[in-house]
Amino acid sequence: MIERTIKNILISQPEPTDLLKNQYKALSSKYEVEFTFYKFFDVVGISNREFRDAKISLLDHSAVIFTSKLSVDNYFRLAKELRLTIPETMKYFCITETVANYMQNYVQYRKRKIFYGKLTFKDLVEVIAKHKEEKYIIPCAEDSSIDYFTLLDNAKIKYTKAV
């Protein structure tokens, strides 16, 4: 049997900021391999001009559904560019607790204001179903999973898809 040695490993994510203090440095020295970091895709938020052309108002909605940290960043970046003040009464629904904790960068974390599912979008829809009176906006990519919207439709949730 032929034994091959691996000398290079391609990591499909951005390079860590501090290479000396992360797990890749330890692996590199232990197994004598070199790590190459390459970001295969880059998600870019839309401009405020494109958002205005879509004729969606952030303030017409009483709740937001976040499926990633990137959607949180883009939502609040867009609100800032449009010079909108997000009301204190706005409710936030996050797919995981990690995304909910990330919200602390933008809003004060309150249990009555930020809700999250266990792990999947189906778990989150169960939480959302308890707040059917809200009007939701869901910031998402153009190629977002259709399953999200099917689950929301089946639960009879009023939402606007903001691409």
Regions found by a protein language model. Give the residues of each.
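Conserved beta-alpha
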Residues: 1-163
